[in-house]
Regions:
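C-terminal alpha-helix
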Residues: 296-304
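Short, hydrophobic-biased amphipathic alpha-helical segments
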Residues: 136, 293-297
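Alpha-helical and His/Cys-centered functional microenvironments
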Residues: 47, 59, 114, 287-290, ...
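Conserved HGGG/HGGXW glycine-rich cap/lid loop of the alpha/beta-hydrolase fold
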Residues: 30-75
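Catalytic histidine-centered segment of alpha/beta-hydrolase-like enzymes
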Residues: 281-290, 294
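Short amphipathic alpha-helical segment that frequently serves as the phosphate-/nucleotide-binding helix
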Residues: 46, 263-264, 294
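Flexible "cap/lid" subdomain of the alpha/beta-hydrolase fold that forms the substrate-access gate
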Residues: 1-18, 24-26, 31, 51, ...
Length: 305
């Protein structure tokens, strides 16, 4: 858990807010007009709200922008007596949304932010207006057998091979010193963005073994298949999910989720919705192409009032 007031040399200048109503202290950013349309930005592995630092300012000129840190990430608390699962992260989000009484939300989800956004929507569709996916999957699309599986990605192969040797746990539970390497394995492309402040910001949530439990459990949750029951439990809400306007931004250098899989999954659910393919952009499009995300998000909202 990072010092709430650390701005990382002014690169994250947003007032901290906290919510402790769901068993841990959760940090979130809340910028822009309180009566504005709500954009709720969800990060994934192994990042935190810092991922959206270049988007919050421009977007908050027109919208209310809320950026939570998941339990075990960023400036949020890392309790050791909690389960770090898709279910728990989704339930944590639901508690925060209810606390803030957010409505007509534009959900933005990258990496694990996509499944969390999806599971939130199938259970709380009345609060969601639109969904903006970025290098992620909803997971409910029926795709052809010729489409690569998520398990075919370089990231998932790395996880599986490392579980046999102990490498996966060693690397991820030491994320404070390995976070850049992990992001490169997943598909981080923009090395020009990396400086001492960048390294410190992404390393700071993980000063020791225990603090990195969330970074370890995210991929294990998927690799082990333990997310399946919770995902299947949301099937009744898929009709509500696909009724929402949606868009997918897909960096084609993604090594966590095969781009062909992400696109096929999305098009199976939203066959007429836009897919924006980004050559040369990796898994972290917020880092690799920040201006593209802001422009496309604004246009998406304007096109779906």
């Amino acid at each position: 858990m990072i010092d709430l007031h650390d701005t990382f040399d002014g690169t994250f200048p947003f007032a901290p807010h906290t919510f402790d109503g769901h068993g841990f202290v959760q940090h979130y950013v809340d910028e822009g007009p309180r009566d504005g349309q709500v954009i709720l930005c969800l990060h994934g592995e192994p990042t935190w709200g810092y991922l959206y630092r270049k988007r919050v300012g421009p977007l908050s000129e027109h919208y209310r922008v809320v950026v939570p840190d998941h339990m075990g990430f960023g400036k949020s608390e890392t309790p050791l007596d909690r389960e770090y699962t898709l279910r728990s992260h989704t339930e944590n989000l639901a508690a925060l949304v209810e606390h803030l009484d957010l409505r007509d939300i534009t959900l933005v989800g990258q990496d694990w932010g996509g499944p969390i956004a999806t599971q939130f929507t199938v259970r709380h569709a009345e609060r969601v207006k639109r969904i903006f996916f970025a290098n992620t999957i909803a997971g409910y699309g029926r795709v052809g057998a010729d489409v690569p599986e998520v398990s075919d990605s370089g990231w998932f192969r790395w996880i599986g091979e490392g579980l046999e040797t102990g490498r996966t746990e060693q690397v991820l539970r030491n994320a404070g010193s390995t976070v850049l390497s992990v992001m490169k394995i997943i598909g981080f492309q923009n090395s020009a963005a990396v400086d001492d402040t960048w390294i410190r910001a992404y390393s700071a949530p993980f000063p020791d073994w225990d603090s990195a439990i969330g970074a370890y459990e995210f991929p294990i949750d998927a690799y082990s298949g333990r997310i399946a029951d919770y995902v299947m439990g949301g099937l009744d809400g898929v009709a509500d999910l696909v009724s929402k306007p949606a868009i997918l931004l897909e960096g084609l250098e993604d090594r966590a989720i095969p781009p062909a899989r992400a696109i096929a999954d999305f098009r199976a659910l939203w066959p007429d919705a836009p897919v924006v393919e980004l050559p040369g952009v990796g898994h972290f499009c917020q880092e690799d192409a920040p201006e593209i995300l802001v422009t496309n998000l604004h246009q998406f909202i304007q096109a779906n009032p």
